[in-house]
Each structure stands twice: as structure tokens, then as C-alpha cells.
Amino acid sequence: MTDAPELLKGPLEDRHRELGANFAEFGGWLMPVSYAGTVSEHSATRNAVGLFDVSHLGKALVRGPGAAQFVNSVLTNDLGRIRPGKAQYTLCCSESGGVIDDLIAYYVDDDEIFLVSNAANTAAVVDALQAVVPAGLTIINQHRSHAVLAVQGPRSTDVLGELGLPTGIDYMGYVDASYAGVPVRVCRTGYTGEQGYELLPPWESADVVFDALVAAVVDARGEPAGLGARDTLRTEMGYPLYGHELSLDISPLQARCGWAIGWKKDAFLGRDALLAEKAAGPRRLLRGLRMAGRGVLRPGLTVCAGDIPIGVTTSGTFSPTLQVGVALALIDSEAAVQDGQQIIVDVRGRAVECEVVRPPFIEVKTR
């Protein structure tokens, strides 16, 4: 019997312990799951501002002549739609149309693209790129190059203003700035559905920026927030989480991510399979479920129309905003389920009535 591998640690573990964080494993990393409590942190983010350390996210750099053109030939979305100083949600797919990972591509210039991926999938993304990279380009796994600090919520702009960081940035844009001599990439991105920013300081200098952010967030009546709140926030928005709503077995079309595919491009990994699936229609589709009564839904529950199984829940939580249980579920297309329809979820042998809704469950405020 071999011992389990030791969990990786981010650059701010000591700071989180000082703040009283509870920790859990995420993608092989030991990360803060909560401080004051998930519901409190969720509400602070929706109503004021939350500060999240997501430094476990992967980073990779593609550099060399024609880097943007190469990345555009591999990842699904069309980099030709954006320009330097902009970021784009995209996917890295297998040739069979499954998802290796979903990620954000930062367009630095034609010869440099910076990628942020899910923690556990960084090596797989790098491997997929390396397998088809032409001579003259380098792909570097930079997992520990930068911390990632997400400042999310209606008062996020006030927080960045307190630090003298730029705020007049278009959604999905970014600016390279500095704080107290520390370079910081300020990105108008997030995973909560709120207006927000993601800051990328160097790994070794992250504490300088984090300490200042904590003080400014508290002054703005916000809270440090853990990955527990990040999950409830993204579930309310219907945002996919890799391993739940996206995987090698769950295609972008099934997860309603077809908008992140450049269908008119000549090439990207999985193109033929995804075009065929688009023509035929996906065999299942991501739906939202809202409980009619009290309780909480969890992943892996069977969804039924009457007594007939028609799908499975992929994520589920109690929505602090709506004060009701919500879930995301993959529902068979042949079941012809409609928004507003009542269906049943089997919760440990108990038939729980839910309404089918189209995510998001609450209003998007990212812009």
C-alpha cells in the first residue's frame, strides 16, 4: 500500500490560517474552503465583495512566432474575435469531442498566449498542445508562476480603487499594472456572476497584494471567501465545473457551451466530432432544477419523468440567494423536457418534485 501523495500548497497558506480558514483538497491542492462560513461568504460576495484565493488554477504560456494562430488551431473558441489585452473563455477538446479542460486564454500578442486552466488538468492541456505544436513554439507549464486572487461583487471596483489599481476595464479585458512595486495583471473576469476582477501577481509576491486586498475588502464590508462559496455562487449562475458539467464524456454542446466554439474555423481539436454532434443534436442537455419544497440536491441523483429515469444531477446546493435547493442536471434530449415542467429527483428513495429551469437561476451582473 502506498501513501497518498502530499497535497500541493499555494503561496498564501499561512495567511489563510491566520484568517481562520478551514481547508480542503481541490485538484490535488490544499485550499481554503471557508472562513466565516460558506453562506456568509456567498452573501457578502452577492451584496458587497468577496476575496477568493484561486492560485491552484493552472497556468501555461505559449510563446513564439505565430503562437496565437497555433492556439486558435487547437482550442475551440475563435481567438480572431479578440485582440491583445483581451481574454476569452475556450475549451481544449479530445478528437472524440470530449472536454480535456475549459480555460481562459489571455491574448498578450500574436506571439504570446497565456492560458489559465483548472488545477488538475494543467498537465493534460500542456500535453495536448505539445502533441501538435510546430517547431519554433514553446509551451511552458507555469503553474507556480502567478497567484490568482479573485475580487468579486458589487463593491469590487471600490476595493481595487483603494489600492490604486485600474478599474475602467471592459468585461474580459485585462491590464498589466503594479501595486507597491509588485507587477499585477488585472483581469475583468470571474466565476461568480457578479462584477469582479481576477488579479495575477507573481507567486512569490502574492502576500503583498493579498494583505492589501483583505484590508480593503473588510473596509468595503466584504469578507475573504473560500472555495465553498465559489461553488455555490457558480452553481446559482449555471456555470460548468470540470468533472461535473464538463468532462471527456460530457461535450461542450451537452453542457450548453457551444457558444465557445468557433464553428467557422478550419481547425480545432475535436472539430469533426463536434460538427457531427451539432448536426445530429446532443443526446443530452444541461438543465437547471429548482426544488418545489425544502431540502438540498446533490450530484449523482437520478432525475425521472414519472417513473422513467431521464437524467442525472451534476451539481447541487442550497441557494443562499433564493433560499431553495437548486441543481444542474444532464437530461436526455429524447425526453423532450421543457422549461417550467415538473420532474422528480430520487433523493435516497424519496421522490422530490423540482421545476425545470434554464440557468442562470439569478440575474447575471458581470458587466
Swiss-Prot record:
Transmembrane feature ranges: none
Disulfide partners: none
Entry coiled-coil feature ranges: none
Keywords: Aminotransferase, Transferase
Gene Ontology molecular function: any one: transaminase activity
GO terms (BP aspect): glycine decarboxylation via glycine cleavage system
SUPFAM superfamilies associated with the record: Aminomethyltransferase beta-barrel domain (SSF101790), Folate-binding domain (SSF103025)
Reaction(s) catalysed by this chain's protein: N(6)-[(R)-S(8)-aminomethyldihydrolipoyl]-L-lysyl-[protein] + (6S)-5,6,7,8-tetrahydrofolate = N(6)-[(R)-dihydrolipoyl]-L-lysyl-[protein] + (6R)-5,10-methylene-5,6,7,8-tetrahydrofolate + NH4(+)
Root EC class: transferase
Cited InterPro entries: GCS_T, GCS_T_bac, GCST_C, GCV_T_N, GcvT/YgfZ/DmdA, GcvT/YgfZ_C, TrmE/GcvT_dom1
Enzyme Commission code: 2.1.2.10
CC terms in the record's Gene Ontology section: cytosol; glycine cleavage complex
Function: The glycine cleavage system catalyzes the degradation of glycine.
Protein family according to the UniProt entry: Belongs to the GcvT family.
SUBUNIT field: The glycine cleavage system is composed of four proteins: P, T, L and H.
Name of the protein this chain belongs to: Aminomethyltransferase
Species of provenance: Mycobacterium leprae (strain TN)
Lineage: Bacteria, Bacillati, Actinomycetota, Actinomycetes, Mycobacteriales
